[in-house]
Every structure is written in structure tokens, then in C-alpha cells.
Amino acid sequence: MSKQPVSNVRAIQANINIPMGAFRPGAGQPPRRKECTPEIEEGAPPTSDEEKKPIPGAKKLPGPAVNLSEIQNIKSELKYVPKAEQ
């Protein structure tokens, strides 16, 4: 049997530079931006007819899709509750 000194120093030193959370999913370098994508004006609405096709059988309803008075009533019922001292 060869006698080699038992040392964990190298194993510990090898792991010093690993940042916290490095092994979590999604850790690492962010995805690179694709520079070859065509530039699209952000202010211009889409002009293709495919995106504006109405759904068959759908009806256009007047007003917003949400009842605003219900939201306002619930909002008025909310109160600020201070944190209880322990």
C-alpha cells in the first residue's frame, strides 16, 4: 500500500469559485440576443390579416370585458391593516 497524505484541501479549493445558486435550474449565462432578426417598428400595429381574423361564432360585445363597477366596489372594501406588533 502506498502512503499518500489524505487531504481534502484540493477538493475544497476546487469548489470555492462556484457562485451561490449555480446548480439551480436556469442558472448560467443568459441566452444571447439574436442579432440577425429583422427590426420591426414597435409603434406600428401588425398589418397582417391572419392576426386580426375574428373567431367564428364570436360576437363583439359593447364595453369592456370586465365589469368595472364590481372591481371598484371590491377596491373600496379593501382596508389597510397595520402589522401587529409581536
Curated annotation (Swiss-Prot):
Residues 20-64 are annotated as: Disordered. Disulfide bonds: none annotated. InterPro entries: Chisel. It comes from the Eukaryota. GO terms for cellular component: costamere; M band; muscle tendon junction. Plays a role in the regulatory network through which muscle cells coordinate their structural and functional states during growth, adaptation, and repair. Belongs to the SMPX family. This is Small muscular protein.
